[in-house]
Amino acid sequence: MLKTTIFAGFLGVSLVSPGFAATQPVAEYGDWRMFVSGAGQSKNCYIAGEPKRSMPKNARRGDVFLIVAHRPGQGVRNEVSVRIGYPFSATSEPFARVGSDEYAFFTGVQVENGADEWAWLETLDDQSRLVTAMKRGNELVFKGTSARGTLTTDSYSLKGVTAAMKSLDAACPAP
């Protein structure tokens, strides 16, 4: 159920990324940008960050970013997703780490339409826990394995994420 619910929001969030020109950020906070699209029941608000470091450096990848989204019309808050810039391996077990805490993700490998480059948190309880850790931490490290077998590591600065989340909460308040 969680995977189905999260994928339902994939199309709306996936179309807006730091690398795409279709949507412009409404605000910037340190290393994070905030985006708002739609209105009423279809309003989407999210913050996005891009990695400061990616390894291996020679890996061929598309856009890479991490998103925290609120979709009040669907009752979604703090949905964390990552676009890795390549199709994940079907056996990849991606995870994020902030400090000593790790958070398991699942991939969209079995889904068509480009979802094979996306990952979402395994459990709903981890969404708010990860966002809280991001507010307190300095860096988030995300690891995943490509369909070609390349393990990648992306390091995201968390500078500005607390202010970005405050703005996100104000732009898309809980119902």
Predicted features and spans:
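A generic "folded-domain core" signal
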Residues: 21-175
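N-terminal signal peptide c-region/cleavage motif recognized by signal peptidases
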Residues: 16-18
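N-terminal secretory signal peptides that target proteins for export/translocation
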Residues: 1-2
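Residue-level detector of intrinsically disordered, flexible termini
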Residues: 7, 20-21
